[in-house]
Amino acid sequence: MACLLETPIRMSVLSEVTASSRHYVDRLFDPDPQKVLQGVIDMKNAVIGNNKQKANLIVLGAVPRLLYLLQQETSSTELKTECAVVLGSLAMGTENNVKSLLDCHIIPALLQGLLSPDLKFIEACLRCLRTIFTSPVTPEELLYTDATVIPHLMALLSRSRYTQEYICQIFSHCCKGPDHQTILFNHGAVQNIAHLLTSPSYKVRMQALKCFSVLAFENPQVSMTLVNVLVDGELLPQIFVKMLQRDKPIEMQLTSAKCLTYMCRAGAIRTDDSCIVLKTLPCLVRMCSKERLLEERVEGAETLAYLIEPDVELQRIASITDHLIAMLADYFKYPSSVSAITDIKRLDHDLKHAHELRQAAFKLYASLGANDEDIRKKIIETETMMDRIVTGSSESSVKVRLAAVRCLHSLSRSVQQLRTSFQDHAVWKPLMKVLQNAPDEILVVASSMLCNLLLEFSPSKEPILESGAVELLCGLTQSENPALRVNGIWALMNMAFQAEQKIKADILRSLSTEQLFRLLSDSDMNVLMKTLGLLRNLLSTRPHIDKIMSTHGKQIMQAVTLILEGEHSIEVKEQTLCILANIADGTTAKELIMTNDDILQKIKYYMGHSHVKLQLAAMFCISNLTWNEEEGSQERQDKLRDMGIVDILHKLSQSADSNLCDKAKTALQQYLA
């Protein structure tokens, strides 16, 4: 909504507006300052809790006039303060109200007001700023535009408990990401806010706590600092632990648990520290019980999922705390009975947000089952859980779908479950549907899971192949998203492992040699490694090697040459030499190496390389080329001897590396046989 409306629109909009609303605005223009003040006070009383009145006054142009009065040097402090109060009340209406206030540049005006010496006016400006900055329509960046604002807010923290509460609330809402964390940290946020945790005001303690949770999130620098901060002779983590005791308000318990969780994940607190194992984790499990409110259960489960995600031991402890796995099953039966919730408004709210519970449960199940086979088994054996997760993967909410697919991905790491539950529930069917049409964030997880379902021992591999997976995966390799390219090629690599010639031919045909070579020159190392892995799996078993090299030999040899000449890692070059070793194992394919002096020189070079892995891979090539039971072995041996390969073999047979020594001796025996 614009700040001032054009004249032609006024009549249609104003038909809704009462004369009394216009009367309030007209009084703001009275030449008598006392009448203006009374007009603002009356306006304040009129708009409290009345959204329609707020909208009317905004349409009638009250905001620019209030801002003008607020900024006028001739206005009394009382008038300025009352203007700030009314503007704060208007901001508490709808999101459209906030947009209108932002369009009128309210933030610079209020920030200017903070330079006043009058505390009541400062508090009114801060209260209004707090309301505006906590609205989802306000860009956080507006707090950081002027570099003098943050230091001034830090200085105002000492003025009163209200300045402390509002400023901390503004910081916790406007601190989004590492850049904001760094700005606040560099301006002394930790030192300025730490002592507020012992404030006599609950609201101040709570807002300070929220500040620390957003400052510490994924931030090792802040987290490492927090660990050593003393407040009244007590370390900050000890204060957080006291705040998550059962006798404290739930909001405080949860936020303290978040602070400790984030500090732990940022590496500032060990995962086996008693404050995590005996305090934070049990507190978060408590938040998952059905006695808690929906929001608390969601936040508790999501924070716990984040805490235990990388640590097997914490996953095991959580899985046996308060029957957590069974407790999470209740997240899907919500609300359990309508009569249990007497507040109809609450019931309506919870029905609208029940999907958040499912999302949180899937996230926590995914973390619990990330590593341990027994935990995965427990999750899957929980009443109809596989059906619920499979259903979740096709829900309309993107967040629920993502969490459900993550959960399936976590469970798909189990060989046992791939062979049993995943087959019983034909998980591959909904997964293929998800892969047809989903946002990238879901595609990345779903394609990762497909990689697992395509492992050679998975019974789902056959039906997936029959349902057009090759084309789908080849399509993923052309994505602009590197994670999707990696997963597409990884799944093809798993598909090609010990596969029949027909499947390999399908992969090569669908992928096209052009795309294969594009992937071999991909800037992402993971893509390159998986493409080499695919090539290695395609070039296995002699008939397949000979067939593929007869049609694509020239291009493959060209790609191999480029990689061996390029600036690549040891791992990439090792994989490439292993591909050459596979080619050297072909019956007719090996001639492509023997007739390529450039490649032979490269193999010789890598036999003398300083890295043992590369020497070993080059040795495999030589062994396969000199194997004397095969036709033409004598000519090959002679050519390699002339190149000085035998001398290198003698040298390597004296190597301190036992592996290298054995391989060299085996190759030399081919010459003696």
UniProtKB/Swiss-Prot annotation:
Primary site of residence: nucleus
Annotated positions of the N-acetylalanine modification: 2
Top-level taxon of the source organism: Eukaryota
InterPro entries, sorted: ARM-like, ARM-type_fold, Armadillo, ARMC8/Vid28
Pfam families: Arm
Keywords per UniProt: Acetylation, Cytoplasm, Nucleus, Phosphoprotein, Repeat
Any one GO cellular component localisation term in the record: nucleus
Compartments reported by the entry: Nucleus; Cytoplasm
PTM annotation (Phosphoserine): residues: 337, 512
ARM repeat ranges, renumbered to this chain: 51-92, 95-134, 138-176, 178-217, 224-265, 269-309, 313-352, 374-413, 416-455, 458-497, 501-540, 543-585, 588-627, 634-673
Keyword Phosphoprotein: yes
Oligomeric form and interacting partners: Identified in the CTLH complex that contains GID4, RANBP9 and/or RANBP10, MKLN1, MAEA, RMND5A (or alternatively its paralog RMND5B), GID8, ARMC8, WDR26 and YPEL5. Within this complex, MAEA, RMND5A (or alternatively its paralog RMND5B), GID8, WDR26, and RANBP9 and/or RANBP10 form the catalytic core, while GID4, MKLN1, ARMC8 and YPEL5 have ancillary roles.
Function description: Component of the CTLH E3 ubiquitin-protein ligase complex that selectively accepts ubiquitin from UBE2H and mediates ubiquitination and subsequent proteasomal degradation of the transcription factor HBP1.
Protein name per UniProt: Armadillo repeat-containing protein 8
Gene: Armc8
